[in-house]
């Protein structure tokens, strides 16, 4: 984008600059209480429905060899690059609903992240729920922990000053939950992280896009992930 050398320095040059993705135009929305199935097909005439089927394609690349293929069930990516990239699929408007993900994530060298990644506005916040990672340099401020989905996550906060964002060059905070026992499949109970962040004074605003993303730089690797409600 998610796109982003310290956890946050990395997530800065990467995460911050990665906020220039491509999106699929929604044609409909989804039930207020559920995420739609991943199919890139959206209807458009029900004001009582809020979330469309997965309708957002994150494809941020700055160079190198990155082969990214979204599908009707998720996405796959292979990379060999010193430059940063962030790819994945999700929703134009994020929410606190759970997200299911599953598949492979392998990093041969360099840094790689597998995360739920998104932004909010008012306040402008870039956030990660990091499920797996390889060789990221952790920096920023540790704010606390949260237990969710069978593991403990360490919560970090970082402030980015005059960096690229979904609103252009701006100053904004990053909220990052890092799972201490990494996994490549499971359910992310997003609400648990939002609640934990809020309890620590880390407040989100209006939801912007939200994706299951793979991000990498400085090496090679591959991933194949399915995404669903």
From Swiss-Prot:
Q: What is its main location?
A: secreted
Q: Which reaction does it catalyse?
A: Endohydrolysis of (1->4)-beta-D-xylosidic linkages in xylans
EC number annotated for this UniProt entry: 3.2.1.8
Disulfide partners:
none
Location in the cell: Secreted
> Which UniProt keywords are listed?
Carbohydrate metabolism, Glycoprotein, Glycosidase, Hydrolase, Polysaccharide degradation, Secreted, Signal, Xylan degradation
Annotated glycosylation sites: 31
PROSITE patterns in the cross-refs: GH11_1, GH11_2, GH11_3
- Does the keyword section mention Signal? yes
Q: Where does substrate bind?
A: 117, 128, 160, 164, 174, 209
The biological pathway it contributes to is: Glycan degradation; xylan degradation
Q: Residue limits of the GH11 domain? A: 52-228
Induction and repression of expression? Induced by D-xylose and L-arabinose, dependent on the cellulase and xylanase regulator xyr1. Repressed by glucose through negative regulation by the crabon catabolite repressor cre1.
Q: Name one GO molecular function term.
A: endo-1,4-beta-xylanase activity
- Which protein, by its recorded name, is this? Endo-1,4-beta-xylanase 1
Q: Which organism is it from?
A: Hypocrea jecorina (strain ATCC 56765 / BCRC 32924 / NRRL 11460 / Rut C-30)
């Amino acid at each position: 984008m998610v796109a982003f050398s310290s956890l946050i320095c990395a997530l800065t040059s990467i995460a911050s600059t990665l906020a220039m993705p491509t999106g699929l135009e929604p044609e409909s929305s989804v039930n207020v209480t559920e995420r739609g199935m991943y199919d890139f097909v959206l209807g458009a005439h029900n004001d009582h429905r809020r979330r469309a089927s997965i309708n957002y394609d994150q494809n941020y690349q700055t160079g190198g060899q990155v082969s990214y293929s979204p599908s009707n069930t998720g996405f796959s990516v292979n990379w060999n690059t010193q430059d940063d990239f962030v790819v994945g699929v999700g929703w134009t408007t994020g929410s606190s609903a759970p997200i299911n993900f599953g598949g492979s994530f392998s990093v041969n060298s360099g840094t790689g992240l597998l995360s739920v990644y998104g932004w909010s506005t008012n306040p402008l916040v870039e956030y990660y729920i990091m499920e797996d990672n390889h060789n990221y340099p952790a920096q920023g401020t540790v704010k606390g922990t949260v237990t969710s989905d069978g593991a403990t996550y360490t919560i970090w906060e970082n402030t980015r000053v005059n960096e690229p964002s979904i609103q252009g060059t701006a100053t904004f905070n990053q909220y990052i939950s890092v799972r201490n026992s990494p996994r490549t499949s499971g359910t992310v109970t997003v609400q648990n992280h939002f609640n934990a962040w809020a309890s620590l004074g880390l407040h989100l605003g209006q939801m912007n896009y939200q994706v299951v993303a793979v991000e990498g730089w400085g090496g090679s690797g591959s991933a194949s992930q399915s995404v669903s409600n």
